[in-house]
Regions:
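Short loop/turn segments at secondary-structure transitions that flank enzyme active sites
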Residues: 1-3, 80-83
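Conserved short "hinge" loops at termini or chain/domain junctions
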Residues: 1-62, 103-124
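Generic detector of ordered secondary-structure context
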Residues: 22, 69-70, 90
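Elongated alpha-helical scaffolds
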Residues: 67-76, 80
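Short helix-capping/linker segments at secondary-structure and domain boundaries
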Residues: 81-91
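Short secondary-structure subsegments characteristic of cysteine-rich extracellular domains
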Residues: 92-106
Length: 124
């Protein structure tokens, strides 16, 4: 799923006043978290380095693949929209949906990828 596809989907499902550059920033934050907390800690990570997205990256594929991408990215963007609008009840529902989808992806990733070995160092 590309950045543009998820932004168009969320704008269709939840019309809002936020510009694409704000949503791209939110997606960068989410993918940076996924990269640092999950992907980078396992062997065979298909991403060597993640620096975030810019407005020129709208056709770029997001890091989390289907079938998880749709639920994770849409729920996350909707939660950010709700939070910024001060709609806390809606935010709680959206962030709960996001947390559930993100945890499901994390568990699947952990099952399919071996964690990197941890080097033990002794300090004298």
């Amino acid at each position: 799923m590309t950045i543009n596809e998820i932004i168009e989907l969320v704008d269709h499902l939840k019309p809002n006043q936020f510009e694409s550059d704000i949503k791209i920033k939110w997606l960068s934050t989410l993918d940076r978290k996924a990269y640092m907390e999950v992907m980078q800690t396992h062997e065979h990570c298909h991403v060597k380095c993640f620096k975030g997205y810019t407005n020129d990256d709208v056709d770029k594929e997001l890091l989390i693949p289907e079938p998880f991408a749709d639920d994770i990215y849409s729920a996350y963007l909707m939660a950010q929209i709700d939070r910024e609008n001060g709609e806390m009840n809606k935010y709680n529902q959206s962030i709960t949906r996001y947390n559930s989808a993100y945890l499901e992806w994390c568990n699947q990733y952990n099952r399919r990828h071996r964690p990197l070995p941890v080097r033990t160092q002794f300090v004298l």
